[in-house]
From Swiss-Prot:
Pathway: Purine metabolism; IMP biosynthesis via de novo pathway; 5-amino-1-(5-phospho-D-ribosyl)imidazole from N(2)-formyl-N(1)-(5-phospho-D-ribosyl)glycinamide: step 2/2. This is Phosphoribosylformylglycinamidine cyclo-ligase. The keyword Chaperone does not apply. It comes from Jannaschia sp. (strain CCS1). Gene3D superfamilies: PurM-like C-terminal domain (3.90.650.10), PurM-like, N-terminal domain (3.30.1330.10). GO terms for molecular function: ATP binding; phosphoribosylamine-glycine ligase activity; phosphoribosylformylglycinamidine cyclo-ligase activity. Belongs to the AIR synthase family. It is an enzyme of class 6 (ligase). One of its GO terms (biological process) is adenine biosynthetic process. It catalyses: 2-formamido-N(1)-(5-O-phospho-beta-D-ribosyl)acetamidine + ATP = 5-amino-1-(5-phospho-beta-D-ribosyl)imidazole + ADP + phosphate + H(+). InterPro entries: PurM-like_C_dom, PurM-like_C_sf, PurM-like_N, PurM-like_N_sf, PurM_cligase. Its EC number is 6.3.3.1.
Length: 349
């Protein structure tokens, strides 16, 4: 009688391709290297990444950390096969938060998880991450690619980002917000990266395919809704350096209604004139197709303003010039007032 043994198994037989992971690292190294900045001490491949705060120019730094994802916007990227800019979204969601604390983003790490690694698709995503980092002056110093068979449906993946920034001690924001301060809104580049569960429901109701012409843009519907989140880091840092900025609010989930109060002291609120900027066409279409009322738009989406600065009244003109010089479209949208809450006048349009 002959003993028989089953064929020997490998990790690849279980669905994990280490060679593909190594190929991805080799593919993305040039993109990551292009993000290097003062303070970076080593390239990709170590067990941890090193960063020298003194070499980055800091004397007495306070570190600020942020983490985020891009939500179900990923589903549109997956459904359309368009992975070129979703990485920019990932970076923006983190670094735009950091700058609201007054911090300069220093470095970034990403987490990419999927059931089966497609090197080409993953490389496009990470190259987008690197592009967002480079535009923000932030180094891509590491990350994790997790191939986990059975955890994700075929073709699905998830992303998370982690970023660390710094400011000198005593310069953290918000600081000094007072009654009479002015709100300056910076235009968004579309829906950005929140509210996409509602967006996808509206698209489903409309009956339009992702490759159909967008009713509100000169592109396909999928391309229009994948427009990446605007990176506000460099303009915001320029404004902070100019002086007079008391707070910044990144307008993400919760919209203007919930994000502005996060940077206000107890007892203060804001009066906002909704007619002081134009509602971008994408939001008009979403409102019409989804029968969304104004309150729903304002608490779900950015409604055309991706960042709001709270500034001294006497600094408005100078800061407006600084921000416009950095490429931003600036709108004076309201003031800080006594009494907690966000009070709207006028209407979106």
């Amino acid at each position: 009688m002959t003993d028989s043994k089953p064929d020997a198994l490998t990790y690849a037989d279980a669905g994990v391709d280490i060679d593909a992971g190594n190929a991805l690292v080799d593919r993305i190294k040039p993109a990551a290297a292009a993000t290097n900045r003062a303070g970076v001490m080593a390239g990709l491949g170590g067990f941890g990444a090193l960063f020298d705060l003194k070499a980055a120019g800091y004397d007495d730094p306070v570190l600020v950390a942020a983490t985020d994802g891009v939500g179900t916007k990923l589903k549109i990227a997956i459904d359309t096969g368009n992975f070129d800019t979703i990485g920019v979204d990932l970076v923006a969601m983190c670094v735009n938060d950091l700058v609201c604390q007054g911090a300069e983003p220093l470095f970034f790490l990403d987490y990419f998880a999927t059931g089966k690694l497609d090197v080409d698709d993953a490389a496009r995503i990470v190259e987008g991450i690197a592009a967002g980092c480079k535009a923000s002056g932030c180094a891509l110093i590491g990350g994790e690619t997790a191939e986990m068979p059975g955890m994700y449906a075929p073709g699905d993946f998830d992303l998370a980002g982690f970023s660390v920034g710094a400011m000198e001690r005593g310069r953290a924001l918000p600081d000094g917000v007072a009654e009479g301060d002015v709100l300056l809104g910076l235009a968004s580049d579309g829906v950005h990266s929140n509210g996409y569960s509602l967006v996808r429901r509206v698209v489903e109701r409309s009956g339009l395919a992702w490759d159909a012409p967008a009713p509100f843009a000169q592109s396909s519907l999928g391309e229009a809704l994948l427009a990446p989140t605007r990176l506000y880091v460099q303009p915001a840092l320029a404004a902070i350096r100019a002086g007079g900025v008391h707070a910044l609010a990144h307008i993400t989930g919760g919209g203007l209604t919930e994000n502005i109060p996060r940077v206000l002291p107890d007892g203060l609120g804001v009066d906002i004139d909704l007619s002081s900027w134009s509602l971008p066409p994408v939001f008009g279409w979403l409102a019409q197709e989804g029968a969304l009322d104004q309150a729903e738009l304002l608490k779900t989406f950015n409604a055309g303003l991706g960042m709001v600065l709270v500034v001294s009244a006497d600094a408005v003109d100078g800061l407006t010039w600084t921000l416009e010089d950095a490429g931003e479209s600036v709108h004076r949208i309201g003031t800080v007032t006594a009494g907690a809450g966000v009070r709207y006048s006028g209407s979106l349009g």
